[in-house]
């Protein structure tokens, strides 16, 4: 089982793989899970939660223990609704990670705290949110996942969305590379 356990401020890890059913059960209740890819790809792991469980505590956990960039994979249509464009017109990233322009919700101050990043992510899921509700640039990194998900691109972005779908959750996640 590949789970991170935090008890009394002490982090311990158990390095066996979980079943998909165990991962989905954890995701359904907002627990972070780790997804690792193949040695022939990035050979790394990402902490993942379903975006609807983005809380100050979960974002802080990701920043503290994974230490990578906190990203939010979402549907292209959702990001287009908010007028959030691709970060670059020609993507030359080795793995073609589809970054968009970063955002903060207008009700945040600096946008960088775990609480404000969680708030921005929650607002990205809000069906009543409008383009003017988001400032650019910001501290939340939306990503566009490929339609067809892991059958088309074997990235953490797409794997996180597949897990959200299988868990019956919204098609949006929060991922953070473990560095």
Each language-model region and where it sits:
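Catalytic domains of riboflavin
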Residues: 12-179
């Amino acid at each position: 089982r590949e789970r991170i356990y935090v008890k009394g401020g002490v982090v311990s890890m158990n390095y066996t793989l979980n079943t998909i059913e165990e991962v989905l059960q954890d995701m359904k209740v907002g627990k972070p899970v780790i997804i690792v890819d193949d040695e022939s790809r990035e050979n790394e792991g990402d902490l993942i939660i379903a975006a609807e469980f983005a809380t100050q505590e979960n974002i802080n956990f990701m920043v503290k223990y994974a230490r990578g960039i906190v990203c939010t994979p979402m549907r292209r249509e959702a990001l287009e609704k908010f007028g959030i464009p691709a970060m670059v017109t020609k993507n030359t990233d080795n793995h073609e990670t589809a970054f968009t322009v970063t955002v903060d919700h207008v009700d945040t101050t600096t946008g960088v705290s775990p609480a404000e990043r969680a708030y921005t992510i929650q607002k990205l899921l809000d069906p009543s949110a409008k383009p003017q509700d988001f400032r650019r640039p910001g501290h939340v990194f939306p990503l566009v996942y490929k339609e067809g998900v892991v059958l088309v691109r074997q990235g953490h972005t797409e794997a996180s969305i597949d897990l959200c779908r299988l868990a019956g959750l919204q098609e949006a996640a929060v991922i953070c590379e473990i560095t």
